[in-house]
């Protein structure tokens, strides 16, 4: 997976057209109304739905006020620079309620659970699970066959552009509600206990816990057994 650097993300956000997408339900005498190409319409004679940007649609609602008896507007973003990721062709399991922005890389057979939030530039390796309510900030990198526990935060770094992202190597287990701050590198096979706040790099095949997180022990057979991942959960 190729890391998307901070300056590229900053330029993308800065130069992207800012959009306020809306969905508008209409009722009235709609048969003769004309809409520009940038407005998507699903209209019958007396009812219909239109999609487009509020800057285009708002003037049309005023212009056609004599023909439109009533309307209802649904809107979930204002001047948004980054759309949500198109999920249709991603070879992963992504559950309802996950919020994943564009320019995120998701490996094969990854699992993204309900309520997870994944920001622009983040990368998730094959067979990794991002559990419920976890937050992956901008440019956070998760390797292969990891588990990022429910409520965990991997701090994002889009600004300042010089900051280093969080890097989680392969086969890492992160317990629920842990926090990994920007620039931390977690080595392969490490275990981070639930609720830990990780402020320094974690060596491979070690376990850390506490606030701030400290070395507890090397990962032994008992710990590896208790933190073993279930491949069946990753089958598509």
UniProtKB/Swiss-Prot annotation:
The pathway it acts in is: Amino-acid biosynthesis; L-lysine biosynthesis via DAP pathway; LL-2,6-diaminopimelate from (S)-tetrahydrodipicolinate (acetylase route): step 1/3
Signal peptide residues on this chain, from the entry's feature table: none
* Reactions catalysed, as given in the entry: (S)-2,3,4,5-tetrahydrodipicolinate + acetyl-CoA + H2O = L-2-acetamido-6-oxoheptanedioate + CoA
GO BP term, example: diaminopimelate biosynthetic process
- Supply the EC number(s): 2.3.1.89
Note the InterPro entries from the entry. Answer: DapH (IPR019873), DapH_N (IPR013710), Hexapep (IPR001451), Hexapep_transf_CS (IPR018357), Trans_hexapeptide_repeat (IPR050179), Trimer_LpxA-like_sf (IPR011004)
Q: Which Gene3D superfamilies match?
A: Hexapeptide repeat proteins (2.160.10.10), Malonyl-CoA ACP transacylase, ACP-binding (3.30.70.250)
The family database entries (Pfam families) matched by this protein are listed as:
DapH_N, Hexapep, Hexapep_2
Sorted keywords for this record are: Acyltransferase, Amino-acid biosynthesis, Diaminopimelate biosynthesis, Lysine biosynthesis, Repeat, Transferase
GO terms assigned for molecular function: tetrahydrodipicolinate N-acetyltransferase activity
* Function recorded in the entry: Catalyzes the transfer of an acetyl group from acetyl-CoA to tetrahydrodipicolinate.
- Which family does the UniProt entry place this protein in? Belongs to the transferase hexapeptide repeat family. DapH subfamily.
* Name of the protein this chain belongs to: 2,3,4,5-tetrahydropyridine-2,6-dicarboxylate N-acetyltransferase
Q: Which organism is it from?
A: Limosilactobacillus reuteri (strain DSM 20016) (Lactobacillus reuteri)
Q: What is the lineage of its organism?
A: Bacteria, Bacillati, Bacillota, Bacilli, Lactobacillales
UniProt lists the gene as dapH
């Amino acid at each position: 997976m190729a890391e998307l650097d901070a300056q590229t993300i900053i330029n993308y956000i800065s130069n992207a057209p800012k959009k306020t997408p809306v969905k508008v339900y209409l009722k009235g005498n709609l048969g003769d109304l004309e809409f520009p190409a940038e407005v998507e319409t699903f209209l019958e004679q007396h009812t219909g739905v239109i999609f487009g940007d509020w800057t285009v649609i708002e003037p049309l609602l005023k212009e056609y006020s004599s023909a439109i008896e009533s309307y209802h507007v649904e809107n979930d973003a204002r001047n948004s620079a980054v759309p949500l990721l198109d999920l249709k062709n991603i070879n992963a399991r992504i559950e309802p309620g996950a919020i994943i922005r564009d320019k995120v890389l998701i490996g094969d057979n990854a699992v993204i659970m309900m309520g997870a939030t994944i920001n622009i530039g983040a990368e998730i390796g094959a067979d990794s699970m991002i559990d419920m309510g976890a937050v992956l900030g901008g440019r956070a990198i998760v390797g292969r066959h990891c588990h990022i526990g429910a409520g965990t935060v991997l701090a994002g770094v889009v600004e300042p552009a010089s900051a280093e992202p969080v890097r989680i190597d392969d086969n890492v287990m992160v317990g629920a509600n842990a926090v990994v701050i920007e620039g931390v590198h977690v080595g392969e096979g490490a275990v981070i206990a639930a609720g830990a706040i990780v402020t320094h790099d974690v060596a491979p095949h070690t376990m850390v816990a506490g606030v701030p997180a400290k070395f507890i022990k090397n990962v032994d057979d008992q710990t590896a057994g208790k933190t073993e991942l279930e491949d069946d959960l990753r089958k598509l």
